[in-house]
């Protein structure tokens, strides 16, 4: 079955609730009273003075200050977001649920809130929901600073996150949120690229439109050999190569293998969207296009991680930056890690091929508000700033590509490599998740037995009516589901190499902000408009002029994501910050991390920030603040929990230096410091790294598993170490080389 063609926004990317059957968060009414009281304290009604005139903007502003976080349905929607943690971080949901329950009782409130819940009148102790608003605000301030009982701070962090993210990213059925006008935000409504036929339709099977009976017909119509196994309730499908994942690695591998004449099946757990499907709405788009709906923390809560989860993977939602692998990194990989591929002409040729296929251009005809500020700030203090190549045209002025490119200008794998693959007979199954790799034992060298991968077991995701499992039997199996998902798939399938899931690098980031009022600065536009990354400032290692230790760039932060990061020091303060949203420029410092983490099970990510990385981030954060001040910001600050900031108009150099000296990179919410911060990551690499020996990594220099013949890894997890810049070109080029070798080996087998 196929989805009916329409030029309307895809139903999954529209605003409004799609289900009218109530909420599934499972919280009791007493717990909901508590969460509503917390939301009200976080975002209280603060009516403006009546002397404001009654222009439409002032009316919107007045309504914004009057609005409260306790207004229905906001608390229920925040609770629904909390429920997202249940799959990957159930301890967090349990913790919040228990605290909400305790706070619904008087003695429990006394235990967690202390004397602020006491009253001279009967019954002398208030439940949390009965405590006056001002005192509830004070309780939340104490929780934010709590150093002894860290679970209370984590409850504060999680409830703040879901309250504000929901409040500012939600949209109704018409794609509208009444508070956006007050903060100067407008959803991208430019004309979309409309295509009569979706580019991948010929090779596409969308399981959410299939049933058991229609699926076998769809598979057969695509030229696949399918048999039904009634005893095991599964369909068995044969092909030359099965690829799990469709992003920067999987998309390239699919094209190379299909172009070589092999029958390829691509499995993608996400759904397929094209340009006219996209809504540019932050909430629905993040929910459908990102892993865990864009809310994916590390186990200790210090790292918030963004990863793509749609057809095209991260290439469909990334920020367009196309940076070739630095020469110094290639030397390190070829010499230190002893992988000759990265010193070869083949790799250089692969980078050229990749850049051609995804339409990389070095030019940008009009820079965005944030990139103008980065460039001008650097120029004023003598920092070198370089242009960043992008995989779109020079006229591409789109700030919402992180929600899918509605103009179709940006070239992700879903509009390039996968189109090539489908044109050569590849079949794509969306809404289809790999559960387990299949292995058989075959004779190896020296009379020993070696595992050989014979394919994969997969199942349709929850939207589908397909109940049968899919057993895909293949000559080669490629895991390309990314650094967060490839290791759990391999480990849950029985592979034992201890390097699988370890050495995870995340390119940790810290953000700085500067406020540029429209009437006081000469920068045009708003922070959500224009190309996302078109300029870069690099900070090099002391002994090198080619290895960036830190890079400073501009991010995409929709109002929901911005509000979730903003420090909360009071309800009034957060409202005053949010009305400045549109003209608040953000810059981030990213480090090529020495520290690493691990991911052994889905969504269970741990990460340790190395001391060197902390110092580098501190250097980068101070430089970012200096750039913002030089560009003319009237106020700058960090996202540290205490709301660290300084007014800049007419500031003395000595006062600025004193402020910058106070900027430290502190620990996450689980640290026992009074102030804390949250780190972010949009690049995940090296969790199944390529190595010269089995003791050093998970796969060999051809991307093949050391443990299982015929099993390859073809995504960012194979990189030997962190790249230090956006890894898209590196991942695609590495995938191109690995897939070319696989195609050659299949040719020899045949």
Swiss-Prot record:
Keywords: FAD, Flavoprotein, Membrane, Oxidoreductase, Transmembrane, Transmembrane helix. Residues 1-24 are annotated as: Disordered. Its main location: membrane. Pfam families: FAD_binding_2 (PF00890), GMC_oxred_C (PF05199), GMC_oxred_N (PF00732). One of its GO terms (molecular function) is long-chain-alcohol oxidase activity. Long-chain fatty alcohol oxidase involved in the omega-oxidation pathway of lipid degradation. This is Long-chain-alcohol oxidase FAO2. The lineage of its organism: Eukaryota, Viridiplantae, Streptophyta, Embryophyta, Tracheophyta.
């Amino acid at each position: 079955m196929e989805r009916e063609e329409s030029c309307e926004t895809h139903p999954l990317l529209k605003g409004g609730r799609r289900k009218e059957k109530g909420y599934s968060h499972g919280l009791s009414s007493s717990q909901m009273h508590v969460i509503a009281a917390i939301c009200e304290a976080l975002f209280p009604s603060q009516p403006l003075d009546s002397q404001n005139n009654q222009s439409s903007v002032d009316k919107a502003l007045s309504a914004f200050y009057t609005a409260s976080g306790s207004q229905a349905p906001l608390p229920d929607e925040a609770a629904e977001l909390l429920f997202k943690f249940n799959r990957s971080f159930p301890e967090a949901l349990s913790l919040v649920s228990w605290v909400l329950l305790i706070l619904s009782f008087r003695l429990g409130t006394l235990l967690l809130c202390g004397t602020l819940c006491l009253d001279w009148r009967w019954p002398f102790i208030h439940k949390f929901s009965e405590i006056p608003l001002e005192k509830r605000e004070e309780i939340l301030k104490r929780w934010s600073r709590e150093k002894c009982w860290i679970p209370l701070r984590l409850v504060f962090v999680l409830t703040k996150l879901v309250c504000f993210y929901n409040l500012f990213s939600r949209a109704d059925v018409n794609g509208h949120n009444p508070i956006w006008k007050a903060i100067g935000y407008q959803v991208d409504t430019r004309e979309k690229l409309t295509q009569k036929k979706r580019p991948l339709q010929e090779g596409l099977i969308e399981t959410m439109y299939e049933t058991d009976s229609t699926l076998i017909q769809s598979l057969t119509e695509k030229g696949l050999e399918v048999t039904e196994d009634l005893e095991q309730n599964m369909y068995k499908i044969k092909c030359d190569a099965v690829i799990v994942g469709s992003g920067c690695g999987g998309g390239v591998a699919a094209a190379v293998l299909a172009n070589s004449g092999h029958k390829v099946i691509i499995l993608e757990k996400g759904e397929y969207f094209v340009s006219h499907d996209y809504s540019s709405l932050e909430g629905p788009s993040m929910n459908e296009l990102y892993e865990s709906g864009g809310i994916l923390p590390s186990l200790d809560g210090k790292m918030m991680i963004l990863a793509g989860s749609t057809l095209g993977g991260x290439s469909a939602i990334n920020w367009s930056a196309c940076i070739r692998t630095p020469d110094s990194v290639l030397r390190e990989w070829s010499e230190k890690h002893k992988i000759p591929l990265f010193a070869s002409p083949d790799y250089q040729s692969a980078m050229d091929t990749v850049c051609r296929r995804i339409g990389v251009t070095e030019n940008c005809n009009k820079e965005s508000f944030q990139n103008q500020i980065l460039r001008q700030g650097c120029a004023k203090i003598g920092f070198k700033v370089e242009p960043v190549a992008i995989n779109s045209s020079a006229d591409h002025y789109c700030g919402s590509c992180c929600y899918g490119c509605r103009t179709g200008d940006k070239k992700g794998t879903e509009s390039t490599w996968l189109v090539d693959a489908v044109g050569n007979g590849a079949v794509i199954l969306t809404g289809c998740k790999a559960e387990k790799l299949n292995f058989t034992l075959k004779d190896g060298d020296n009379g020993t037995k070696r595992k050989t991968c014979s394919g994969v077991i997969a199942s349709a995701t929850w939207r589908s009516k397909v109940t049968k499992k899919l057993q895909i039997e293949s000559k080669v199996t490629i895991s390309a589901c990314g650094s967060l998902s490839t290791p759990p798939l391999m480990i849950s399938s029985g592979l034992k190499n201890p390097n699988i899931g370890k050495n995870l690098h995340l390119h940790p980031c810290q953000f700085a902000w500067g406020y540029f009022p429209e009437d006081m600065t000469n920068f045009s536009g708003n922070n959500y408009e224009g190309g996302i990354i078109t300029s870069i400032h690099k900070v090099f290692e002391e002994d090198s002029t080619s290895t960036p230790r830190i890079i400073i760039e501009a991010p995409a932060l929709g109002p929901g994501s911005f509000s979730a990061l903003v420090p909360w020091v009071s309800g009034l303060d957060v409202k005053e910050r949010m009305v400045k949203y549109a003209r608040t420029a953000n810059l981030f410092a990213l480090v090529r991390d020495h520290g690493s983490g691990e991911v052994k099970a889905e969504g269970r990510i741990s990460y340790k920030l190395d001391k060197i990385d902390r110092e580098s981030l501190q250097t980068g954060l101070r430089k970012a603040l200096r750039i913002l001040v030089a560009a003319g910001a009237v106020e700058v600050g960090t996202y540290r929990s205490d709301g660290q900031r300084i007014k800049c108009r007419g500031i003395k150099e000595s006062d600025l230096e004193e402020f910058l000296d106070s900027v430290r990179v502190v620990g996450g919410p689980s640290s026992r410091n009074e102030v804390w911060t949250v780190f972010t990551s949009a690049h995940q690499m090296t969790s199944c790294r390529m190595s010269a020996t089995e003791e050093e990594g998970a796969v060999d220099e051809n991307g093949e598993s050391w443990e299982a013949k015929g099993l390859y890894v073809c995504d960012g997890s194979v990189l030997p170490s962190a790249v230090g810049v956006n890894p898209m070109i590196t991942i695609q080029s590495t995938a191109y080389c690995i897939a070319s070798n696989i195609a050659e080996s299949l040719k020899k087998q045949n």
